[in-house]
């Protein structure tokens, strides 16, 4: 008996696919293709091609975390001109791919092609498809470029054309969970790459924590949870391009979806690490919660409103992923660098030993970190070139700024009386400063006749302010005594000349033999109890941290907890920082000078505070109060002094303006609130009518610190409260 020989089935030739992706994600996509059964992958900029069966294409649509689109190539041909493009496209049997009642669109990319206009190339392909349908059935399919059912992709590379069906439809970064948007959101595909490259895998131990302290809309957290839970990114999508494709295999797709559902259910039954997110912006927190709920992960991810200043260690080990703000404008970047500085310090204090993934578009800012990055990846956030830095957070040891060591001055000789007084002041003040955690204070304030200058210590630096010679005095003799005093400073405190800055009271540069060139701007960071400030020791208008107001700032800190704080003519916001650090619920700082508010925001960031509840407003305080509808439990009014001049009516006019400002401020003070008035005018007294209408107290003597004891009070302070309401009847 002869057994018939059955002819061998011809193997179907493999299909050709291309997955497009953001720059820098190609190797991640290639790894996914291999995991989903693809073969012979080839990596190109922004795309990875491979061969495989239809299942590999479907799996990439369902499971790819990093790809943007999955294209199934139909054909390729030479197209030296648009007419050839039309003819070759007309040879394809479009009935195999597209139903006449399915809206479609053609999208094209062109690289070094003789057909240089991408939209014209797409139009010729569209015409070829529509003309073929019309010639066969008398009907033309509709074109919808905004929401097409089927997307046809044309890629022209030189004179070579490639046509493909877009199996993904909408870009794969659209997972389906984003319900609420925030400013500058990350694409989901990029967010997934950030957490994956930072070291997150399904095997992440459940006793650890994934933390994003600036979570925005929660995209990094959600993508992390989807990795941990073995969730297919495409499982929540409502539509794919292949659902409108005539060769779609419904049974295959259902099988893959059912498998993905089972895997996700199994993943959610496993022990999970805690996933935590914070943001200073309450609107961002609301958006994150909406997105997390839409992703079905509200039982896995916890988010809350919290300032970066409150960042603390939630577990012994964990992974921190963070995408700080970039600062598109130069002024914004200048402010945000201080947020980076705070983050660097806080991470070293709180999260030593944790892994970190730090995503930034500004290499200068990230380069200022004290961390040693173990890996760095070039990525793009849209058109913005970025880097993801990864590593392990090292513990940073912060040393409190020590006080200068005291040395014996030369005995006898010129300036001996000044040297003795300076040394006595230091011995009296240094123990007090250490006890009160104060590193910036006055060392000398015109204590002795003939030495009319002020010496202020700002941690490692000295600011020497010389006063003009008295009427009839010899300016050259005054300058000589100024230099004698500087010599004593160098001897007693061992301060090198480069750390001594000179200033002339009332503006202008003080001549002296010590100190750097005053034309160079020098910004330093200094501490004041638990606050950190920027000081400018080369600006004749002020340092940004007036030492005479220190006690007032500390009083504001003691009074701020649980209150809303308003700082009028708030300058560099130093009083606001004390309110923030000590628990103010919300703050508003008003000042007419943009430069002052720029420094105020920098000070906020330097202390880890930001968000819309801490506002800075550039406007005249009285004008702003006229339209204010908010109420504040604590208000500081910084009133300017009366300008020098021959106008005899100026003092009374200034007192009237102060009264108008105070009455307007009292209107926005809560019934139980406290208003503090500080005036840079030693002769100022409030109008009698204010004392009649409000409870008024002169608190100047209570706010005189040891370093200003015995000196004239040049900045009197007053406290105002509302009088109790009269009982009705």
Description of each model-found segment:
Residues 307-402, 673-729:
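C-terminal catalytic and target-recognition region of SAM-dependent MTase-like enzymes
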Residues 88-180, 440-456, 463, 478-546, ...:
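Non-catalytic substrate-recognition/targeting regions of SAM-dependent transferases
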Residues 186-312, 335, 552-611, 618-621:
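Conserved S-adenosyl-L-methionine
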Residues 2, 8-38, 42-43, 47-67, ...:
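S-adenosyl-L-methionine
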Residues 227, 295, 346-350, 664-671, ...:
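Conserved helix-to-beta-strand junction in the class I
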Residues 311-319, 626-636:
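A short acidic, Gly/Pro-enriched loop at the edge of an enzyme's catalytic core
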Residues 23, 64-72, 380-387, 392-481:
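Polybasic, low-complexity RNA-engagement segments
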Residues 44-107, 460:
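Conserved AdoMet
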């Amino acid at each position: 008996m002869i057994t018939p020989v059955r002819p061998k089935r011809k193997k179907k030739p493999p299909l050709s696919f291309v997955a497009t992706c953001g720059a820098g994600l190609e190797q991640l996509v290639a790894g996914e293709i291999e995991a989903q059964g693809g073969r012979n992958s080839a990596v190109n900029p922004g795309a990875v091609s491979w061969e495989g069966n239809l299942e590999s294409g479907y799996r990439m649509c369902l499971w790819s975390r990093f790809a943007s689109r999955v294209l199934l190539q139909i054909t390729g041909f030479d197209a030296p001109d648009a007419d050839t493009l039309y003819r070759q496209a007309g040879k394809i049997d479009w009935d195999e791919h597209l139903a006449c009642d399915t809206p479609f669109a053609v999208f094209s990319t062109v690289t070094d092609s003789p057909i240089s206009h991408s939209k014209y190339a797409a139009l010729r392909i569209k015409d070829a498809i529509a003309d073929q349908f019309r010639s066969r059935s008398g009907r033309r399919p509709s074109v919808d470029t905004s929401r097409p059912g089927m997307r046809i992709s044309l890629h022209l590379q030189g004179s070579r054309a490639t046509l493909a069906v877009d199996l993904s439809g909408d870009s794969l970064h659209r997972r389906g969970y984003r319900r609420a948007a925030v400013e500058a959101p990350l694409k989901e595909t990029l967010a997934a790459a950030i957490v994956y490259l930072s070291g997150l895998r399904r095997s992440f131990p459940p006793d650890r924590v994934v933390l994003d302290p600036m979570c925005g809309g929660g995209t990094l957290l959600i993508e992390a949870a989807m990795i941990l839970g073995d969730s297919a990114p495409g499982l929540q999508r409502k539509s794919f391009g292949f659902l409108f494709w005539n060769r779609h295999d419904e049974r295959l797709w259902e099988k893959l979806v059912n498998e993905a559902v089972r895997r996700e259910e199994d993943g959610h039954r496993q022990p999970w690490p805690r996933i935590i997110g914070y943001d200073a912006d309450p609107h961002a927190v609301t958006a994150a919660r909406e997105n997390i709920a839409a992703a079905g992960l509200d039982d896995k991810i916890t988010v809350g409103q919290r300032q970066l200043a409150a960042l603390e260690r939630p577990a012994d080990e964990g992974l921190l992923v963070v995408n700080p703000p970039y600062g598109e404008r130069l002024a914004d970047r200048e402010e945000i660098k201080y947020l980076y500085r705070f983050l660097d310090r806080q991470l070293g204090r709180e999260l030593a030993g944790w892994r970190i993934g730090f995503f930034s578009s500004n290499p200068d800012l990230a380069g200022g970190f004290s961390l040693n990055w173990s890996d760095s990846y070039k990525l793009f956030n849209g058109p913005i070139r970025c880097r993801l830095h990864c590593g392990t957070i090292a513990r940073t040891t912060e040393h409190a700024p020590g006080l200068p060591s005291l040395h014996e001055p030369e005995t006898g000789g010129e300036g001996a009386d000044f040297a003795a007084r300076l040394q006595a002041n230091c011995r009296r003040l240094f123990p007090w400063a250490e006890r009160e955690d104060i590193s910036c204070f006055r060392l000398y304030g015109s204590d002795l006749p003939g030495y009319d200058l002020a010496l202020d210590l700002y941690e490692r630096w000295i600011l020497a302010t010389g006063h003009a010679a008295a009427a009839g005095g010899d300016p050259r003799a005054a300058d000589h005594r100024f230099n004698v005093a500087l010599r004593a400073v160098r001897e007693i405190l061992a301060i090198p000349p480069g750390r001594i800055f000179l200033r002339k009271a009332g503006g202008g540069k003080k001549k002296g033999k010590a100190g750097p060139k005053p034309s160079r701007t020098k910004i330093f960071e200094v501490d004041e109890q638990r606050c950190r400030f920027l000081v400018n020791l080369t600006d004749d208008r002020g340092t940004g941290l007036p030492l005479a107001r220190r006690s007032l700032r500390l009083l504001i800190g003691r009074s701020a907890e649980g209150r809303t704080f308003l700082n009028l003519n708030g300058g560099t916001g130093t009083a606001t920082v004390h309110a923030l650090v000590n628990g103010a619920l919300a703050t508003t700082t008003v000042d007419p000078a943009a430069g002052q508010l720029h420094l105020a925001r920098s000070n906020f960031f330097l202390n880890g505070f930001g968000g819309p509840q801490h506002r800075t407003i550039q406007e005249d305080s009285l004008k702003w109060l006229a339209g204010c509808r908010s109420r504040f439990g604590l208000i500081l009014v910084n009133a300017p002094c009366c300008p020098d001049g021959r106008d005899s009516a100026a003092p009374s006019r200034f007192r009237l303006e102060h009264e108008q400002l105070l009455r307007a401020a009292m209107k926005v003070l809560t019934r139980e609130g406290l208003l503090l008035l500080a005036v840079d005018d030693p002769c100022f007294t409030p109008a009698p009518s204010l004392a009649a209408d409000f409870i008024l107290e002169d608190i100047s003597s209570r706010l005189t610190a040891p370093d200003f004891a015995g000196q004239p009070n040049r900045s009197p302070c007053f406290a105002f409260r509302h009088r109790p309401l009269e009982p009705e009847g």
